[in-house]
Swiss-Prot record:
GO terms for molecular function: ATP binding; metal ion binding; protein-exporting ATPase activity. Its main location: membrane. This is Protein translocase subunit SecA. May bind 1 zinc ion per subunit. The keyword Membrane applies. The keyword Transcription does not apply. The gene is secA. Zn(2+) binds at C457, C459, C468, C469. The lineage of its organism: Bacteria, Bacillati, Bacillota, Bacilli, Bacillales.
């Protein structure tokens, strides 16, 4: 049974239910929430927004109330830090560049007058403890410089303030140039700001604005959910195939006798080969019996062991039966030569190696298919349906390939006796003791008689050596 606990699951309720079949239950807080969540402030430009953010931080800092500034990226956190340095407001920056000081910075973030700039990942899972006199000032104030694509992350940022019944407040500062607003913001909101002729530094503060932003976030979440759901549907195809292969592999590992499995594989290979060359829509005279004979002799039997006359005049079922009988007889002979114990071990090794290699190749092929399958949509075909169909065909082909390779290796394996290994195993020396052998005497190097080029040739022709046998030397 799957279960989990988190403070921000409610916004993802639909995904938990549809994909994992899990319901989301909201448990009441331990103590009543005293945090005040102020409506969003939306500005016309990003420049105006950051001016307002810095002004707000400076005001709150003067009161002594601690501020936690949440940013979407490291770049934004450094920009806010730069602006605060110009105003000479002391602060700490908590991002990926100085994560080693994370514990120290978080510990002081709730102290009076503290200003902390943090990305959404920094300092998560840590309660910011309020210092002396901070509760009277209103607790920790969380200031968001931008809305995230997911409401869940915004809720995590808000939740840094007002923990365990402590006082606190939160507010987000937005601009029409923010990534979220540019991609998913309402055109009505833009035209409304233009019609009102609002100044750059004049914000809109309205629950309607906050709701419009939440609607934009829901659209993003919906798009992301659809993308994850589609990925899961594609992954389900591989998951089903993986379960089948792993189940069969486990059976091989746990089994002490694979003979029945091997015999089934051999019969399947014979049946497939016979069916391939004896189609039902052809008359027996047109069947390619020689192709069956050549395949069987090359992969399952010895050369010449099966002849065309052995299967001529038989229907496909009788052919399969006749060939299977020959192959199983050959299998029994091989087992006698190899001994049953060694045969079982050999079968297991061959089967595991073949399955592992073929499965790895199949994963690569499925990955290649997945990368280009979306192009089928241009042909008015459903890419997911095409992926399932072709993936199943490829899986069937892989299973057939495993059966053929295992059958061939087992039936074509040669039993070789390694005499030297046997002697070593018995403790006998492979070579005689060289200490008792007499050292070989070095033979003198004999040089033949050299003949000058102008001397008489040794063949007795009377010619000079250079003009006879020595010509060209």
């Amino acid at each position: 049974k799957l279960a989990g606990m988190t403070g921000t699951a409610k916004t993802e309720e639909e995904e938990f239910r549809n994909i994992y079949g899990m319901d989301v239950m909201v448990i009441p807080t331990n103590k009543p929430i005293a945090r005040i969540d102020k409506p969003d402030l939306i500005y016309k430009t990003m420049e105006a927004k950051f001016r307002a953010v810095v002004n707000e931080i400076e005001e709150i800092h003067k009161k002594g109330q601690p501020v936690l500034v949440g940013t979407v990226s490291v770049e934004t956190s450094e920009l806010v830090s730069k602006l605060l340095n110009k105003r000479r407001v002391p602060h700490h920056v908590l991002n990926a560049k100085n994560h080693e000081r994370e514990a120290e910075i978080i510990e002081g973030a709730g102290q009076q007058g503290a200003v902390t700039i943090a990305t959404n990942m920094a300092g998560r899972g840590t309660d910011i403890k309020l210092g002396e006199g901070v509760r009277e000032l209103g607790g920790l104030h969380v200031l968001g410089t931008e809305r995230h694509e997911s409401r869940r992350i915004d809720n995590q940022l808000r939740g840094r303030a007002g923990r365990q019944g402590d006082p606190g407040s939160s507010q987000f500062y937005l601009s029409m140039e923010d990534e979220l607003m540019r991609r998913f913001g309402s055109d009505n909101m833009r035209s409304m700001m233009e019609r009102l002729g609002m100044e750059e530094d004049q914000p809109i503060e309205s629950r309607l604005v906050s709701r419009a932003v939440e609607t934009a976030q829901k659209r993003v979440e919906g798009n992301n959910f659809d993308a994850r759901k589609q990925i899961l549907q594609y992954d389900d195809v591989m998951r089903e195939q993986r379960e089948i292969i792993y189940k069969q592999r486990m059976e091989v590992l746990e089994s002490d006798n694979l003979r029945k499995i091997v015999e089934t594989m051999i019969k399947d290979v014979i049946d497939r080969t016979v069916r391939l060359h004896t189609p039902e829509n052809e008359v027996p005279e047109d069947w390619d019996l020689m192709a069956i004979v050549n395949y069987m002799n090359a992969n399952l039997l010895q050369e010449g062991e099966l002849e065309e006359k052995d299967i001529k005049g038989l229907d496909p079922e009788e052919m399969v039966e006749a060939i299977t009988e020959k192959v199983i007889a050959r299998y029994n002979e091989k087992e006698e030569q190899f001994t049953p114990e060694h045969m079982r071990e050999f079968e297991k090794v061959i089967m595991l190696r073949t399955v592992d290699r073929k499965w790895m190749n199949h994963i690569d092929q499925m990955d290649q298919l997945r990368q280009g399958i979306h192009l089928r949509a241009y042909g008015q075909n459903d890419p997911l349906r095409e992926y399932r169909f072709e993936g199943f065909e490829m899986f069937e082909a892989m299973i057939a390939s495993i059966e053929e390779e295992v059958s061939m290796y087992i039936m074509k394996a040669q039993v070789q006796q390694n005499l030297e290994r046997q002697k070593v195993a018995e403790g006998k020396a492979v070579h005689q003791d060289t200490s008792k052998q007499e050292p070989k005497k070095k033979q003198p190097i004999r040089k033949g008689e050299t003949i000058g080029r102008n001397d008489a040739c040794i063949c007795g022709s009377g010619k000079k050596y250079k003009n006879c046998c020595g010509a060209g030397k």
